[in-house]
């Protein structure tokens, strides 16, 4: 083989090596970005799929990229993700698809109706396609009043509902401490407004401050 042939082979080998290295790092970044978003949804019921929309040749290349979400970023949908490599920060455009449970109306509700647990149904589906403020659990809707007509099967959102304070700050409340095999009743004074299933702080007669959950009947439950 002549000298030119040797140089050509060496150059070709170098380019192949660089391409392989880039592909490996790109694959690593894709895995790391997916793992980053998986950690945002630790519950086993949520399924996360991340599509990186930025062309692969524009991805930063380093072994340990520092990945962060911008402040006030939505947890799904189109997200501009900050990736810092060797002190240089780039933004990678991603589409985060999340499937999980969300709350829908179990029946048609008229404006002004108070919702009970029987009016709420949990459904499995894509969370990133839901309207803003969609409810991922029923607690917020329980005991709330609908601000407009809600159709059966319609996803529930925060701006559809007005929560009713079942406990108001300064109100005397009954506190029920629930232990294994025993219950203890006592009284205290609520320190904040709270709706059903909200957390509320209570100052007891002794001066001690405890936190509990508001039950349907307005009592405060504390698990021991």
From Swiss-Prot:
Record keywords: Bacterial flagellum biogenesis, Periplasm, Signal
Gene3D superfamilies hit by this protein: 2.30.30.760, Antifreeze-like/N-acetylneuraminic acid synthase C-terminal domain
GO CC terms in record: periplasmic space
GO BP annotation list: bacterial-type flagellum assembly
Coiled-coil region(s): none
Residues of the signal peptide: 1-26
Highest taxon, organism lineage: Bacteria
UniProt subcellular location: Periplasm
Keyword flag Signal: yes
Main location: periplasm
Role noted for this protein: Involved in the assembly process of the P-ring formation. It may associate with FlgF on the rod constituting a structure essential for the P-ring assembly or may act as a modulator protein for the P-ring assembly.
UniProt similarity note: Belongs to the FlgA family.
Protein name (database record): Flagella basal body P-ring formation protein FlgA
Taxonomic source organism: Yersinia enterocolitica
High-level lineage: Bacteria, Pseudomonadati, Pseudomonadota, Gammaproteobacteria, Enterobacterales
């Amino acid at each position: 083989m002549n000298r030119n042939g040797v140089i050509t082979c060496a150059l070709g080998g170098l380019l192949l090596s660089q391409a392989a290295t880039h592909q490996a790092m790109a694959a690593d970044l894709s895995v790391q970005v997916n793992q980053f978003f998986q950690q945002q949804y630790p519950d086993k019921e949520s399924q996360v799929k991340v599509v990186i929309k930025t062309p692969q040749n524009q991805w930063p290349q380093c072994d340990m990229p520092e990945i962060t979400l911008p402040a006030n970023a939505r947890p799904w949908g189109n997200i501009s993700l900050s990736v810092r490599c060797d002190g240089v920060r780039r933004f990678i455009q991603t589409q985060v698809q999340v499937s999980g449970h969300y709350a829908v109306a179990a029946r048609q509700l008229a404006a002004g109706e108070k919702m009970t647990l029987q009016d709420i149904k949990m459904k499995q589906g894509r969370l990133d396609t839901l309207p803003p403020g969609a409810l991922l659990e029923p607690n917020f809707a329980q005991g709330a009043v609908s601000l407009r007509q809600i159709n059966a099967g319609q996803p529930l959102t925060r701006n559809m509902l007005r929560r009713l304070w079942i406990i108001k700050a300064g109100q005397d409340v009954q506190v029920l401490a629930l232990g294994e095999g025993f219950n203890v009743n006592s009284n205290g004074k609520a320190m904040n407004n709270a709706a059903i299933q909200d957390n509320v702080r209570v100052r007891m007669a002794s001066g001690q401050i405890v936190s509990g959950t508001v039950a349907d009947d307005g009592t405060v439950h504390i698990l021991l």
